[in-house]
Amino acid sequence: YTAAFSETPDPNPNYAHLSYEDIKAITASGHVEIQNHSYDMHSQSPRFGSKRRQGENSQSYKAFFCGDCIKLQQLLKDKCGITPTAYTYPFGAITPDTTEYLKELGFKASLGCEEKCNYITRDPECLFLLGRYNRPSGISTWEFMKKALKGSAK
């Protein structure tokens, strides 16, 4: 895919994307998994990622959050034949109740944005709110891994 994108300019080089055909092809390889990162919670305003808005009641929030998750789950199933099992919070914006909502929807794991090492045990609960290291553009793999390894020494 790198060659294809190198030869054909991405319509938005600041935020590359994959088509459903791309997703089908890379998941068929067996080397890549696609997970849920929300259908439409990638703004910072009026809602910050998937976080509950101030003054929003829990019933409305649950309906909104779960509806968004289900929409992407269904699209990926219908168009790509896959069902994500993990959810990654946009911006790492987490509302405490969402872990329970995700479990109700059948998710097996979730990732926040806290840069930390994860200690995986046989307890399935340890798979929720996993830490992750976001790699920004403009930094080498060496620099990125050095930072991540430094974080693991804490």
Task: Write out the residue ranges for each language-model feature.
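C-terminal active-site subregion of NodB/CE4 polysaccharide deacetylases
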Residues: 29, 33, 39, 43-154
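Active-site beta->alpha N-cap acidic-glycine motif
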Residues: 1-31, 42, 78, 82
